[in-house]
């Protein structure tokens, strides 16, 4: 039984919260980390803390994504671990939703995931090794009122991950989708004192991602649901 090992990670849609927790965990495990976001100014402190490198990229633009992978390859190494954390939202009564806002939400949540995954897979297939992780949400499996665009994007991302897992697992690429069913704790958003641990801790989520990455190929997870102990489902 062999535990997979990874050397270079690329986190797309990086920011504070889960992405930061993942960057810290991976850097502690001696994995080189690249962070990608539309605006990288916000990533300065995290890069200083973890030794990660930041790259500007619009994940919905095919040329930008191809350029991103080229930059990471030249300046760090070819990623053998890719995490897609980006998501887009547009909320409101169904008849009030602007088509352009809906299209953008779907593009960020799902189409960007396709573009990033395609570039990753092209590089992983020759070595028959790699992992691609997608961050989903409650909306990956449940469409909420006045949140159709988010559900559309997250449903599509889940379908992408499932299709990829079925095609690519036999070729040595571990594809996994995570349903984050609940609010993630942050400095700006935390639970009430009388409801301890009623929100997801980003460090705990990152640890679950890591546990999936350590799975031997004889027992791979393709989807994992994570929620606080008091979350109804």
Regions found by a protein language model. Give the residues of each.
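Conserved glycine-rich cofactor-binding loop
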Residues: 15-16
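A short, exposed helix-loop element centered on a Lys and neighboring polar residues
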Residues: 117-118, 162
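Catalytic Tyr-X3-Lys loop
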Residues: 88, 95-114, 133, 157
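Active-site loop of short-chain dehydrogenase/reductase
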Residues: 6-7, 78-79, 93, 124-137, ...
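C-terminal helical subdomain
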Residues: 170-185, 191-233
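Conserved glycine-rich Rossmann-like NAD(P)H-binding loop of the short-chain dehydrogenase/reductase
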Residues: 29-45
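Rossmann-fold cofactor-recognition segment
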Residues: 49-63
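Catalytic loop of short-chain dehydrogenase/reductase
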Residues: 131-156, 161-162, 166-169, 184
């Amino acid at each position: 039984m062999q535990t997979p090992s990874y050397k270079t990670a690329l986190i797309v849609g990086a920011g504070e919260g889960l992405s930061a927790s993942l960057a810290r965990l991976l850097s502690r495990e001696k994995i080189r980390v690249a962070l990608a976001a539309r605006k990288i100014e916000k990533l300065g402190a995290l890069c200083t803390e973890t030794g990660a490198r930041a790259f500007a990229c619009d994940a919905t633009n095919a040329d930008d994504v191809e350029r991103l992978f080229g930059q990471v390859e030249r300046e760090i190494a070819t990623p053998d671990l890719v995490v897609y954390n980006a998501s887009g939202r547009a909320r409101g009564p169904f008849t009030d939703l602007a088509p352009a806002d809906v299209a953008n939400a779907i593009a960020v949540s799902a189409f960007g995931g396709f573009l990033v995954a395609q570039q990753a897979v092209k590089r992983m297939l020759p070595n028959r090794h790699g992992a691609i992780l997608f961050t989903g949400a409650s909306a990956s499996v449940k469409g909420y009122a006045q949140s159709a665009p988010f559900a559309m994007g997250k449903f599509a991302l889940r379908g992408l991950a499932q299709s990829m897992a079925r095609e690519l697992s036999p070729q040595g690429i571990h594809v996994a989708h995570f349903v984050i069913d609940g609010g993630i704790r942050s400095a700006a958003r935390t639970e009430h004192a009388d409801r301890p641990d009623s929100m997801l801790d980003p460090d705990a989520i990152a640890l679950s991602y890591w546990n999936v990455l350590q799975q031997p190929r004889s027992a791979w997870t393709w989807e994992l649901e994570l929620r606080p102990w008091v979350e109804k489902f």
